[in-house]
């Protein structure tokens, strides 16, 4: 059975992700107590259901400590994937304010005896971060701070389409002016490279467009940067595998996340497709939803 566990911070988009999985044919359950999960998986498997998605958050805080052990145990019999959704505190506060929803931990006792009850939304968010932080290491992280709901749905679909027999490497382009991604395991700054933005004909385009590709591809310094990053990844990927890592997010950043980072993320993803399962996604580039995230295969290699 394929089991997808969705966890993370309240307000980060778990409901959107769960709905996307339901549309993909998964049997979905929200806020399931972790200790019930093995029994539910057996029950559904006996009934012929082969895809289960479960959202777990701070509302199950009393039994969150059980979840890491359950993940290891379930992985012995099932294809278990963990999706950890995160967002900046500023983005979360704005979302709760817009929806007028109450945070699950608002008014709950603080872990600091000097504070008493968690009176502010920010305190509740930070308390929840502490509670769910141990789960982040088990899953693939997505920072939804700047994502539209339809983009998140697409990224979730790409996540479940990927094979699960090897390390999954996610190349993510972004713009520093919009903030660094919270989900990055490795981050490379390519702002030292010549910027197509200053060519008025290239400015409205992205690193997916042929004129920008031709501009950057003609520059030796761009290839030096790509070669150096690729060599670093090839050296250290075996060590990430030995550490039993399932997911690795490599963030490539330029100023606006539109030209250089997009081109380099695409090029690196194509190069690495022979050596790992690869997804490339573009956080800030003005591209259509389908182009914002895609699987990369060996046929994409240059």
Swiss-Prot record:
HAMAP family noted in UniProt: RapZ_like
Protein name: Nucleotide-binding protein BamMC406_2713
UniProt keywords, alphabetically: ATP-binding, GTP-binding, Nucleotide-binding
GO molecular function terms listed in the Swiss-Prot or TrEMBL record: ATP binding; GTP binding
Residues holding GTP: 57-60
Disulfide bonds: none
Sites where the protein binds ATP: 8-15
Family named by the database record: Belongs to the RapZ-like family.
Role played: Displays ATPase and GTPase activities.
Annotated NCBIfam families: PRK05416.1
